């Protein structure tokens, strides 16, 4: 009985000495260039691929519903994503990831790029931005793997932040 008690106390002590914490990351995917009537699975596919990688890396992940815009805003995003950013911040997110899934024209069902921007919710500063090719997979399964590969690049870049 004493051995069990000692092991339990040692585990508890280790947990107190080395606190376990994970950063919380909130995702918002915005499809740009499509008409409102267009139907595509790529937004959900990219969102899932990116979120899976972050989750597997130990982050707590949340998301907002996929949105649509006629075109990607140039710089100031506050008028477009302010509510989603505010909700993520109130929920305790440390980072806010925006993925602009860009389509060449309104009739296209295949995207050509995914522009990912990551903001620190405490400072509201852009800490990462990169464009990834999208729509290059021969099928949805391959496209999902492309999204996951992009997520791995992003997660590896976040380790130093």
Please report, for each region that a protein language model flagged, where it lies by residue:
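Bacterial N-terminal signal peptides that target proteins for export
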Residues: 1-10
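Bacterial N-terminal signal peptides
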Residues: 9-19
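Boundary at the C-terminal end of the N-terminal hydrophobic targeting segment
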Residues: 20-24
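A short, hydrophobic beta-strand-centered structural micro-motif
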Residues: 25-30, 79-108
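N-terminal segment of the mature soluble domain
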Residues: 37-91
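Sec/Tat-exported extracytoplasmic proteins
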Residues: 50-58, 105, 122, 154-158
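Amphipathic beta-strand/beta-sheet edge segments enriched in Tyr/Trp
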Residues: 98-138
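C-terminal partner/receptor-binding element of secreted or periplasmic proteins
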Residues: 132-161
């Amino acid at each position: 009985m004493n051995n069990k008690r000692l092991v339990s106390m040692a585990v508890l002590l280790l947990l107190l000495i080395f606190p376990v914490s994970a950063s919380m990351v909130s995702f918002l995917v915005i499809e740009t260039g499509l008409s409102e009537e267009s139907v595509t699975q790529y937004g959900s596919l990219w969102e899932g691929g990116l979120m899976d990688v972050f989750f597997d890396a130990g982050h707590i992940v949340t998301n907002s519903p996929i949105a649509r815009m006629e075109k990607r805003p140039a710089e100031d995003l506050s008028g477009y994503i302010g509510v989603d950013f505010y909700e993520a911040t109130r929920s305790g997110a440390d980072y806010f990831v925006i993925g602009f899934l860009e389509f060449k024209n309104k009739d296209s069902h295949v995207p050509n790029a995914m522009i990912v921007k990551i903001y620190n919710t405490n400072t509201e500063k852009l800490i990462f931005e990169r464009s990834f090719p999208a729509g290059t997979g021969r099928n949805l399964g391959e496209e999902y793997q492309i999204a996951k590969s992009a997520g791995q690049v992003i997660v590896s870049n976040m380790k130093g932040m």
